[in-house]
Amino acid sequence: MLTFKLVHLIQYHSDRLADSLLCQVKMSGRARSYCNVSPVELKDRVHDIYHHLGSWLLDKRESDIDQRYAAIGARRTEQQVPLSELIWVIVLTKNTLYKFVDDVSVPGQVADIAEKQELLQRLSQFFDEAIYATTAGYEHAAAQRVHPPQASAKTRTNTRQVG
């Protein structure tokens, strides 16, 4: 059973975790293009993940994660954030959670170790899916920018008749 204590602690400290991540992004040489992303927007996105973590891990379907993260990928395409930097920030987001879980876990207690392992496994699955969906959304938006969808043949015909 997923430890609600650890999830609750993450949710309770979501502001602090989001602030920590923002600081890491600013300091990272691997996320330079994030100057194109509003700090408020980034903090809101990260805070939402941390604050609603239990819901994301227990209640959300894969399609919910896909939809949410594909939109993030598309948005970062618009903001001209390279895919490598986008993925790096997702990795930083995950690592911030991992470090927090390590910091608040009581070492040596078998029950806590099992609960921690379960949480880390679920987090890993969540972030793997998030990385895939983000990349797919990013690639789709990038392809749309290079080759915008053409008007349908019917629309082109109607336009010619009017003009």
Pin down the residues of each PLM region.
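Long, amphipathic alpha-helical coupling/dimerization segments that relay conformational signals between
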Residues: I65-G163
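N-terminal low-complexity or simple alpha-helical regulatory segments
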Residues: L2-S84
